[in-house]
């Protein structure tokens, strides 16, 4: 039976489209959903438990509070839902595993001599992006194929440096050396256009263009260029031969199928362009236990194409999608042309889906073999923590905190993040202590916690600070824990789960409990906590030592008249360290911009 507060929240829900957020007693968002009519959708959860699926029953039993956001349409609600799931990664939502940093290929069309390289973020900077790819390995393979076919430059300057002779890349046939004039601007632009067509799956157009360029080069007796075009044609034909499918397909389409075991689903996507398979990717989905097949695929389609740079006119799926009409409308708007979603239930689409599904099953099998021991251990650890600490759910997100200083100098704090038992280094954050003087670790912890949670509900919070942790781990005992608990209470976060892990006896302290919890030394839960604690310590210490090192460099150079911040940075950049500057010859010092003979002599004398 919902609490009176929850019943009032449900009763006050509007009959508008929008997004609803369900929170547990700790204030953690555990589910995000969208609805054409908010009131009707949310009320459908609060029926007799016997009418609910087991997973939904567990969700409803955890709901303590509701929030909602009204949108102008169901399509707007879909986009907002996607952004909130990506930001908060709620425990009960189906979600792409590790979706925060999928790699893309970027073509820098905003540069005179464009490059093609791997990136994990997209910007509105005039570049062209392809992806996302499921792994760094797959995007590196694609980049390697492109490099061998088109030999574009890979130097990491926006403008290639003028050189008198080509570099090693040219000698090993990996670059056409625009920096030495070995290729004209027009020919280089042709090359990049061919690479784009290739990535779009239009290899037949590339072949026609290359054949034309080969014949033109041969006619003007430019046999070196003609031979290059011939080799490119041969290589592309080899690639095309490997793209034939057993099933007969035509046109441009993506085919999507999945295989499931427990809470993990492996989704396989085949990218078909002009009747040929130009690529395939595998993605892991979490939170799929007891979900309907059509719902699982709907969630994948939403989350994948939300960040995809290429949307085909046709998408074939293994099962009918629960949100097909709204997804078609949304994808058509994103593509700028009609998108049709169909289920491959018979005929040629079914033959194609069967192949994709077989690949998904094989990928799931390989993933299970690879991750069996580690995944089982992490699951055991999280479930053991839930039981030992009395948490409502296994702690999906654990944040670890530590302080590092020497008698109050160069004091820093660290925050490390583990999700589902694995470190999420992109979310790590470090804090330089600003308000505390002297060696007062308790006050330093208070500052770090205040700054971290002060960003919680800000628009610019970023992914590191936007979500509340399921569990906070403090490196220390009762004193450190009490200090942090006091700060959390002051911030209105009384329900936040927090523990201290004391290093001497590896005892776990909980707020309000006089006796610590002691776990067995071989306990997966204790080993996970130790790893989080040690990682927070390592991250804080590394930052502290880095600041000390820079402080030492600064003080040594500050004693030299004429060396200000700009020259100091330039010297360190050129020679790497004070030791490197000390060992530099007078002539080497004079090569540094802004260093004249008198200043160089002063540096040599004073160092």
UniProtKB/Swiss-Prot annotation:
* Location within or outside the cell: Cytoplasm
Q: Name one GO biological process term.
A: nucleotide-excision repair
The organism encoding this protein is Dehalococcoides mccartyi (strain ATCC BAA-2266 / KCTC 15142 / 195)
- UniProt lineage: Bacteria, Bacillati, Chloroflexota, Dehalococcoidia, Dehalococcoidales
Summarizing the function annotation, the protein's role is:
The UvrABC repair system catalyzes the recognition and processing of DNA lesions. UvrC both incises the 5' and 3' sides of the lesion. The N-terminal half is responsible for the 3' incision and the C-terminal half is responsible for the 5' incision.
Major location category of this protein: cytoplasm
| UniProt keyword list | Cytoplasm, DNA damage, DNA excision, DNA repair, Excision nuclease, SOS response
Q: Which PROSITE patterns match?
A: GIY_YIG (PS50164), UVR (PS50151), UVRC (PS50165)
Spell out the subunit comment: Interacts with UvrB in an incision complex.
Q: Name one Pfam family in it.
A: UVR
Checking InterPro entries in the record gives: GIY-YIG_endonuc, GIY-YIG_endonuc_sf, GIY-YIG_UvrC_Cho, Hlx-hairpin-Hlx_DNA-bd_motif, RuvA_2-like, UVR_dom, UVR_dom_sf, UvrABC_protein_C
List, for all copies, the residue spans of the domain called UVR: 204-239
Q: What is this protein called?
A: UvrABC system protein C
Family per similarity comment? Belongs to the UvrC family.
Q: Name one GO cellular component term.
A: excinuclease repair complex
């Amino acid at each position: 039976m919902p609490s009176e507060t929850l019943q009032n929240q449900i009763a006050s829900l509007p009959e508008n489209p929008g997004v609803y957020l369900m929170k547990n007693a700790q204030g953690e968002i555990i589910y995000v959903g969208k609805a054409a009519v908010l009131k009707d959708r949310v009320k459908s959860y609060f029926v007799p438990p016997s009418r609910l699926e087991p997973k939904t029953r567990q969700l409803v039993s955890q709901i303590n509070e509701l929030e909602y956001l009204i949108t102008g349409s169901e399509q707007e609600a879909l986009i907002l839902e996607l952004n909130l799931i990506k930001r908060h990664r709620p425990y009960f939502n189906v979600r792409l595993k590790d979706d925060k940093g999928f790699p893309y290929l970027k073509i820098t069309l905003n540069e005179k001599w464009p490059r093609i390289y791997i990136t994990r973020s997209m910007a509105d900077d005039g570049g062209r992006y392809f992806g996302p790819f499921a792994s760094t390995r797959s995007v590196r393979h694609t980049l390697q194929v492109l490099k061998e076919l088109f030999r574009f430059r890979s130097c990491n300057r926006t403008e290639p440096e003028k050189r008198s002779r080509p570099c090693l890349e040219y000698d090993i046939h990996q670059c056409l050396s625009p920096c030495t004039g070995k290729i004209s601007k027009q020919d280089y632009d042709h090359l990049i256009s061919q690479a784009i067509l290739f990535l779009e799956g239009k290899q037949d157009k590339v072949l026609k263009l290359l054949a034309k360029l080969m014949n033109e080069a041969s006619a003007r007796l430019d046999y070196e260029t003609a031979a290059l075009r011939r080799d490119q044609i041969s290589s592309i034909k080899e690639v095309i031969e490997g793209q034939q499918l057993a099933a007969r397909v035509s046109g441009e389409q993506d085919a999507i199928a999945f295989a499931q075991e427990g809470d993990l689903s492996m989704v396989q996507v085949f990218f078909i362009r002009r009747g040929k398979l130009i690529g395939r990717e595998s993605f892991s989905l979490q939170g799929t236990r007891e979900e309907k097949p059509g719902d699982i695929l709907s969630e994948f389609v939403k989350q994948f194409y939300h960040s995809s740079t290429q949307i085909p006119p046709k998408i074939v799926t293994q099962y009918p999608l629960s949100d097909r009409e709204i997804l078609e409308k949304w994808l058509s708007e994103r593509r700028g042309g009609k998108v049709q979603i169909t289920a491959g239930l018979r005929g040629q689409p079914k033959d194609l889906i069967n192949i994709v599904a077989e690949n998904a099953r094989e990928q799931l099998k390989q993933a299970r073999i690879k991750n069996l021991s580690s995944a089982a251990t992490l699951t055991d650890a999280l479930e053991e923590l839930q039981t030992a600490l009395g948490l409502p759910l296994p702690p999906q997100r654990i944040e670890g905190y530590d302080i590092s200083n020497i008698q109050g100098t160069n004091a820093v704090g660290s925050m490390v993040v583990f999700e589902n038992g694995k470190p999420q280094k992109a979310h790590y954050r470090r804090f330089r202590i600003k308000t505390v003087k002297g060696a007062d670790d308790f006050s330093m912890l208070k500052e770090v916690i205040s700054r971290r949670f002060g960003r919680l509900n800000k628009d610019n919070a970023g992914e590191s600070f936007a979500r509340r942790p399921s569990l906070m781990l403090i490196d220390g005992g009762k004193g450190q824990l009490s200090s942090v608990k006091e700060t959390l209470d002051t911030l209105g976060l009384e329900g936040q789960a927090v523990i201290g892990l004391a290093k001497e006896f590896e005892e776990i302290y909980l707020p309000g409990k006089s006796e610590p919890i002691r776990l067995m030394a071989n306990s997966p839960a204790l080993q996970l906590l130790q790893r989080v604690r040690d990682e927070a310590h390592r991250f804080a210490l590394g930052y502290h030592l880095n600041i000390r090192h820079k402080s030492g460099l600064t003080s040594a150079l500050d004693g030299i008249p004429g060396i200000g911040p700009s020259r100091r940075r330039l010297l360190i950049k050129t020679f790497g360290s004070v030791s490197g500057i000390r060992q530099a010859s007078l002539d080497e010092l004079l090569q540094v911009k802004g260093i004249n003979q008198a200043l160089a002599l002063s540096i040599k004398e004073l160092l």
